[in-house]
């Protein structure tokens, strides 16, 4: 169910509320919501480094793959940065990684939106959201997260777990056990959060999701080693 009355928010929070500072690498490949993600994390006290090549990430404690746009152009841009192998090695080494929106979808093997292969880090595919009567398409607006397994990002019974979505495609992993939360879309359940060891990915935009987005980012930052 979409909730349209909550005002749109981008996180601008007090730095003093978060005393643990990290260097976070934000992958800049020409498809990301770089500005709003940067401002959100800086307001939480984090140092953000824009990553365009491998050497720039050597001092980072975590990497973020943001994304707004289409699957194939995003994969082409990533290929042109020579970062694909580095992203795969980063995740396989156990370092913290966060994918946001299109950044989640690129982690999969393929997408209905394009013909190119994805990163293939997560087994499964990205499917077109089905047309359902009385449901908005594309899926744009606020939805309440449903916890599907115990995880470090949301807690069962928490109030106001509403987050902001803008997407036309949704993730269908082969292993449903990595889905940490979903949202209702008519009779369908759409993947909202994937958590698998050091790999975290969300279909919604935490940087545009008010207090719930703040909580999500804080808990992820707390888990960074």
Regions found by a protein language model. Give the residues of each.
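Cationic, low-complexity basic patches in intrinsically disordered or flexible, solvent-exposed regions
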Residues: 6-7
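Short acidic low-complexity segments
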Residues: 48-59
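Cysteine-nucleophile active-site neighborhood
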Residues: 69-140
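Pocket-forming structural segment of enzyme catalytic cores
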Residues: 110-187
